[in-house]
UniProtKB/Swiss-Prot annotation:
Belongs to the hepadnaviridae P protein family. Hepadnaviral virions contain probably just one P protein molecule per particle. Multifunctional enzyme that converts the viral RNA genome into dsDNA in viral cytoplasmic capsids. This enzyme displays a DNA polymerase activity that can copy either DNA or RNA templates, and a ribonuclease H (RNase H) activity that cleaves the RNA strand of RNA-DNA heteroduplexes in a partially processive 3'- to 5'-endonucleasic mode. Neo-synthesized pregenomic RNA (pgRNA) are encapsidated together with the P protein, and reverse-transcribed inside the nucleocapsid. This is Protein P. Residues 1-177 are annotated as: Terminal protein domain (TP). The keyword Ribonucleoprotein does not apply. Residues 178-335 are annotated as: Spacer. Keywords: DNA replication, DNA-binding, DNA-directed DNA polymerase, Endonuclease, Host-virus interaction, Hydrolase, Inhibition of host innate immune response by virus, Inhibition of host RLR pathway by virus, Magnesium, Metal-binding, Multifunctional enzyme, Nuclease, Nucleotidyltransferase, RNA-directed DNA polymerase, Transferase, Viral immunoevasion. Disulfide bonds: none annotated. It comes from Hepatitis B virus genotype D (isolate Germany/1-91/1991) (HBV-D). The record marks 63 as: Priming of reverse-transcription by covalently linking the first nucleotide of the (-)DNA.
Length: 832
């Protein structure tokens, strides 16, 4: 007869009417009993012949991707002018006095951040924008281009101008000013390590290992520039740097880089001086043929025997006869002035050699599940975390649940700040740019690759015969709709572009590490400035706590002003005031301890409602189920050990079948969640120890010992001794000399014992006692004779490796222990 849920509960000692613990508990360590229970609950039967179930509620296999939904009306989020102050360390020192070594080291790490991949693989431009939405190719192309353009305008990306130069918007940092070049030509490279063979040959060489020795390169670049005492302004030709992309008001000669004429071929004379025969886009297709070369003065290009120059693909339609009702020439003729073919940034900079390629693809998705009106750019630089040359990203401490509770469970009022576009605050050194390239090959190539009717041959690309091969009803309708949104920008966006990251991108494993270092250093500074308050951060989530609401508001004002003075952008609409229970990292943390947030509890209920019984479930779906249940496991009676059968099936990659009893057991576990309470400091006065054959306890001056019926593995014996000590004394601080018991991970013990021990020892804190000093050592060996002196072992709750309370420097801080905020009387009012 299968084991019923009631029997199973009684077996696990979860009911009160169990016999004496010293007899019942060792029985659960018996391997034979564990095997029989596993067979009864159908936990060990992994080889099943029935087809597997691949979907449980919303859970599908871990690797089956949910199809993202394209929204043609996505808004591109705006990025304020994010510019983190370069002298951030100096500003923090003005605020709080000298910084600690830890804070300084973390802030230096991101000023600027550096990225050293082992090998960079360059991909053709066609891979720049991923064809993620086959139904909405053109729409997705323009939306993504617009997003990239917005990022470039906000100073988050560099735009590759030539192999060795890039332009950007926003305020330059000092390391970018060292690398600025002014009116001297881009290719004057007789001296220094940047000299290279001519562009054509170097670009067509294979880019398999083009990692530059960046450390030495940065030094060279800086040294070469030190001799020249140029300021930014002095370096720039008064004529060579007009605001590009703005048509001059006069009707005289045209100073725009891209002229109004249909061919887009001529440059103004002063531009020609600043940029000798250099193409803005030396783009190459994967086969090595030139795709488009814009803005080359025709005489110089031809005289140097370069490839033929093709005029602008978009504007060519103006001079051609419409091929049908859906010809693109109808759209091109809508406007007289389509603006420039390319825009250029406010500042120019020399870069290490940057091929006309990309290193990662981009696509758009919803900003988050609750906000589908705005888009988010997904950047895939996964090449750096895969294969033989993968970069092993630095590890960083994530506070565990107990540390988090010890730290934040208090009677403070809480408020959380939202840092807008947190990743894009941290600047990257320009030498990293050639490794983090995104972009697109231009609309013509994009459409040509993906449309079925285009007969595109390399030798006749850009010529008139196949210009109209692009025309199709779908493209025409899409462009007409997009024209309403983007207007004359359609022309700009239809050109190829290559952009490199100037701030840290989200798709690289280094970025979360750097962000965590940055925000933890800033919070450490804030905590020392306001010693009676608490500031804590995890990634871009920053929380502030204070004793009273009015106190919290003034702290909020002071901290916000401080963060703004550093150049950190906060999103005021998303500041949340939590009262006394803080919502943070998926938990609700109050003075009673922590519990999972409500939406997670609802998800768990939903999961159990849909969970089928007696049907084999695909192990990938089990991974999803364990992911959800594992998050809430610390709040249940039996904790992680209860999920061990599921872990075992995932490890062996077999299907798992829920028996009615096991499902009822889990269901009951997760219906009643107990808060994880904060640990309190105290003195340890109860000690436990064991040998394979016996156990011993010391409770104050009382000592006890006992023997096991059969010898047990030492870790199991130590765990049993700890359980006896807890149930006999009721003390919540125990001393033990066993590291496994100390770790409170009971998943490696026999399954039934692990589940029962987790419930008995829930909320117990352990202190390590070396065996030689453990008062329970003698009783465990059967000797009750001599009593050792009792140790006074203090227990201090841990806050993990979050390096929270940085020691204040010895220099007295010049800020008194209170919040400063400008009184309106002192600031606004003037005596008459």
């Amino acid at each position: 007869m299968p084991l019923s849920y009631q029997h199973f509960r009684r077996l696990l000692l979860l009911d009160d009417e169990a016999g004496p613990l010293e007899e019942e508990l060792p029985r659960l360590a018996d391997e034979d009993l564990n095997r029989r229970v596993a067979e009864d609950l159908n936990l060990g039967n992994l080889n099943v012949s029935i087809p597997w179930t691949h979907k449980v509620g919303n859970f599908t296999g871990l690797y089956s991707s949910t199809v993202p939904v394209f929204n043609p009306y996505w808004k591109t989020p705006s990025f304020p002018n994010i510019h983190l102050h370069q002298d951030i360390i100096k500003k923090c020192e003005q605020f709080v006095g000298p910084l600690t070594v830890n804070e300084k080291r973390r802030l230096q790490l991101i000023m600027p951040a550096r990225f050293y991949p082992k090998v960079t693989k360059y991909l053709p431009l066609d891979k720049g924008i991923k064809p993620y939405y086959p139904e909405h190719l053109v729409n997705h192309y323009f939306q993504t281009r617009h997003y990239l353009h917005t990022l470039w305008k906000a100073g988050i990306l560099y735009k590759r101008e030539t192999t060795h130069s890039a332009s950007f918007c926003g305020s330059p940092y000092s390391w970018e000013q060292e690398l600025q070049h002014g009116a001297e030509s881009f290719h004057q490279q007789s001296s220094g390590i940047l000299s290279r063979p001519p562009v054509g040959s170097s670009l067509q060489s294979k880019h398999s290992k083009s990692r530059l020795g960046l450390q030495s390169q940065q030094g060279h670049l800086a040294r070469r520039q030190q001799g020249r005492s140029w300021s930014i302004r002095a370096r720039i030709h008064p004529t060579a740097r007009r605001p590009f992309g703005v048509e001059p008001s006069g009707s005289g000669h045209n100073t725009n880089l891209a002229s109004k004429s249909a061919s887009c071929l001529y440059q103004s004379p002063d531009r020609k001086a600043a940029y000798p025969a250099v193409s803005t886009f030396e783009k190459h297709s994967s086969s090595g043929h030139a795709v488009e070369l814009h803005n080359l003065p025709p005489n110089s290009a031809r005289s140097q025997g370069e490839r033929p120059v093709f005029p602008c693909w978009w504007l060519q339609f103006r001079n051609s006869k419409p091929c049908s009702d859906y010809c693109l020439s109808h759209i091109v003729n809508l406007l007289e002035d389509w603006g420039p073919c390319a825009e250029h940034g406010e500042h120019h900079i020399r870069t290490p050699r940057t091929p006309a390629r990309v290193t990662g693809g981009v696509f758009l998705v919803d900003k988050n599940p609750h906000n589908t009106a705005e888009s988010r750019l997904v950047v895939d630089f996964s090449q750096f975390s895969r294969g033989n040359y993968r970069v092993s990203w630095p590890k960083f401490a994530v506070p565990n649940l107990q540390s988090l509770t010890n730290l934040l469970s208090s009677n403070l009022s809480w408020l959380s700040l939202d840092v807008s576009a947190a990743f894009y605050h941290l600047p990257l050194h320009p030498a990293a740019m050639p490794h983090l390239l995104v972009g697109s090959s231009g609309l013509s190539r994009y459409v040509a690759r993906l449309s079925s009717n285009s007969r595109i041959f390399n030798h006749q690309r850009g010529t008139m015969q196949n210009l109209h091969d692009y025309c199709s009803r779908n493209l025409y309708v899409s462009l007409l709709l997009l024209y309403k949104t983007f207007g004359r920008k359609l022309h700009l966006y239809s050109h190829p572009i290559i952009l490199g990251f100037r701030k840290i991108p989200m798709g690289v494993g280094l970025s979360p590490f750097l962000l965590a270092q940055f925000t933890s250093a800033i919070c450490s500074v804030v905590r020392r400035a306001f010693p009676h308050c608490l500031a804590f951060s995890y990634m871009d989530d920053v929380v502030l706590g204070a004793k009273s609401v009015s106190h919290l508001e003034s702290l909020f004002t002071a901290v916000t002003n401080f963060l703004l003075s550093l150049g950190i952008h906060l999103n005021p609409n998303k500041t949340k005031r939590w009262g006394y229970s803080l919502n943070f990292m998926g938990y609700v943390i109050g003075c009673y301890g922590s519990l999972p947030q409500d939406h997670i509890i609802q998800k768990i209920k939903e999961c159990f409602r849909k969970l089928p019984v007696n049907r084999p479930i695909d192990w990938k779906v089990c991974q999803r189920i364990v992911g959800l249940l594992g998050f809430a496991a610390p709040f249940t009676q039996c904790g992680y050990p209860a999920l061990m059968p599921l872990y075992a099936c995932i490890q062996s990659r077999q299907a798992f079948t829920f028996s009615p009893t096991y499902k009822a057991f889990l269901c009951q576990q997760y219906l009643n969640l107990y808060p994880v309470a904060r640990q309190r400091p105290g003195l340890c006065q109860v000690f436990a120890d064991a040998t394979p054959t016996g156990w011993g306890l010391v409770m104050g001056h009382q000592r006890m010992r006992g023997t096991f019926l059969a010898p047990l593995p030492i870790h199991t014996a130590e765990l049993l001794a700890a359980c006896f000590a807890r149930s006999r004394s009721g003390a919540n601080i125990l001393g033990t000399d066993n590291s496994v018991v100390l770790s409170r991970k009971y998943t490696s013990f026999p399954w039934l014992l692990g589940c029962a021990a987790n419930w008995i020892l829930r909320g117990t804190s352990f202190v390590y006692v070396p065996s030689a000093l453990n008062p329970a050592d003698d009783p465990s060996r059967g000797r009750l004779g001599l009593s050792r002196p009792l140790l006074r072992l203090p227990f201090r709750p841990t806050t993990g490796r979050t390096s929270l309370y940085a020691d204040s420097p010895s220099v007295p801080s010049h800020l008194p222990d209170r919040v400063h905020f400008a009184s309106p009387l002192h600031v606004a009012w003037r005596p008459p």
